[in-house]
């Protein structure tokens, strides 16, 4: 018997569960990261009304920029007291000793300032000593193998002295020399910074007389007239000539202004305010400057100085004793006239110079264009003695002349005042620390 069992097919059902994870986080009012909690800088827009100093970049030549309120390029150069300088690698910069404010490098290399090397130099020491220029003002030389930037101040920190020069406010002006024009700097301590591998600085003697070229141009003939740059008050007889290619940072007292003179244009300037002037070589300064004095009344400088010389025809004398007497007499007369004219001219010059000195016009010079002129608004020629600080401590004498000891009260406190009426004395004011004891004493007296 064959049993055939037909089994039911076994079917298993598996439940598939699809679970989707949902995370609900409450959004905080402000998300503050660790970086924000520890940051030490702010966005540039939060700092307003101030110039931003940008880090130096790849440079081929030095860049000088004055910081502050700058005026028009045709009238005023600047009124700033800070000079920002960006320097390329291997180009030295010379700064007046004590004027360096800051050194900072580029963003890509934060260690670029570590390669800056410094040294102290005294350029043109012997020439400055000969021409009466302060030769003890050294210059700090900075150079680096990577580009860097610096800030330079218009004031130089110097060693303290009893007599200190009253410098006052100073401002910067930036000169760019392209090799076509030279600059004659008459204020020898005004060069605060300079840079340029082909920049040349030299010292030359100030011309005492104008050139024949200028004398003929003004119609003076071959007569010599002074430039007015040298005087017995001013012991400096030299000036600094800047030539070549480079950048120079000059400082002046007060504000610095630029004047551009066209051809044959003339201007009168107090020589103490003249900072610099463009020249063509070291011997061109005598071709544009002449001393000027204000004439007295209706006197003209040209008329008084350029009077035509009358050439007399030679006289013939008879070869006898009377002719010799006439010849001697005429020679004596000519000598007397020359002496009288010299005395008159000398007295007129003294009178004119004295008048100009009293009214303050003795330092004026005339400059003839075409020239570029830099003038400073203030004059630095005064010295001040700093005030002596007084001690705030009060010294109390211990003993007086009558050998009575003066004791200083060491305790302080609050006291109550009261008044009593005493016979024969009237109102008597007294003080007491406690009213209770005083009231008891008054009660005992009344009993």
From Swiss-Prot:
GO biological process, one term: inner mitochondrial membrane organization
One Pfam family of this chain: AIM24
Keywords: Mitochondrion, Transit peptide
Organism, as annotated: Candida tropicalis (strain ATCC MYA-3404 / T1)
Gene that this polypeptide is encoded by: AIM24
UniProt protein name: Altered inheritance of mitochondria protein 24, mitochondrial
Family: Belongs to the AIM24 family.
Chief localisation class: mitochondrion
Keyword Transferase: no
Transit peptide start and end: 1-29
Superkingdom of the organism of origin: Eukaryota
Cellular compartments annotated: Mitochondrion
Keyword Coiled coil: no
């Amino acid at each position: 018997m064959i049993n055939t069992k037909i089994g039911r097919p076994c079917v298993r059902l598996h439940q598939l569960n699809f679970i989707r994870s949902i995370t609900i986080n409450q959004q905080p009012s402000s998300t503050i990261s660790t970086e924000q909690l520890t940051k030490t800088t702010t966005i540039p827009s939060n700092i307003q009304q101030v110039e931003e100093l940008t880090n130096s970049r790849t440079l081929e030549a030095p860049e000088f920029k004055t910081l502050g309120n700058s005026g028009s390029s045709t009238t005023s150069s600047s009124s700033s007291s800070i000079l920002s300088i960006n320097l390329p690698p291997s180009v030295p910069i010379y700064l007046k000793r004590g004027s360096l404010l800051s050194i900072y490098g580029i963003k890509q290399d934060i260690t670029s300032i570590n390669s800056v090397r410094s040294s102290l130099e005294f350029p043109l020491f012997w020439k400055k000593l000969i021409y009466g220029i302060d030769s003890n003002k050294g210059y700090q030389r900075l150079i680096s193998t990577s580009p860097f930037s610096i800030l330079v101040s218009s004031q130089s920190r110097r060693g303290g002295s009893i007599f200190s020069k009253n410098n006052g406010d100073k401002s910067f002006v930036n000169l760019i020399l392209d090799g076509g024009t030279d600059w004659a700097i008459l204020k020898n301590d005004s060069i605060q910074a300079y840079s340029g591998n082909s920049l040349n600085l030299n010292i030359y003697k100030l011309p005492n007389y104008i050139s024949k070229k200028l004398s003929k141009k003004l119609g003076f003939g071959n007569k010599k007239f002074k430039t007015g740059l040298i005087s017995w008050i001013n012991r400096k007889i030299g000036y600094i000539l800047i030539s070549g290619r480079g950048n120079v940072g000059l400082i002046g007292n007060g504000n610095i202004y630029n004047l551009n003179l066209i051809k044959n244009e003339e201007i009168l300037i107090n020589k103490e305010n003249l900072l610099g002037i463009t020249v063509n070589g070291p011997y061109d300064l005598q071709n544009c400057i002449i001393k000027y004095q204000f004439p007295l009344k209706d006197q003209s400088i040209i008329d008084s100085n350029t009077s035509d010389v009358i050439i007399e025809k030679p006289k013939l004398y008879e070869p006898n004793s009377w002719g010799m007497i006439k010849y001697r007499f005429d020679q004596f007369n000519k000598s007397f006239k020359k002496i009288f004219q010299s005395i008159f001219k000398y007295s007129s010059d003294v009178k004119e110079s004295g008048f100009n000195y009293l009214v303050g016009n003795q330092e004026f010079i005339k400059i003839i264009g075409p020239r570029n002129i830099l003038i400073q608004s203030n004059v630095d020629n005064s010295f001040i003695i700093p005030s002596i600080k007084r001690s705030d401590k009060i010294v109390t004498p211990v003993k007086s002349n009558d050998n009575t000891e003066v004791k200083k009260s060491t305790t302080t406190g609050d006291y109550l005042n009261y008044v009593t009426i005493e016979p024969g004395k009237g109102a008597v004011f007294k003080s007491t620390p406690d009213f209770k004891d005083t009231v008891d004493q008054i009660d005992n007296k009344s009993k």
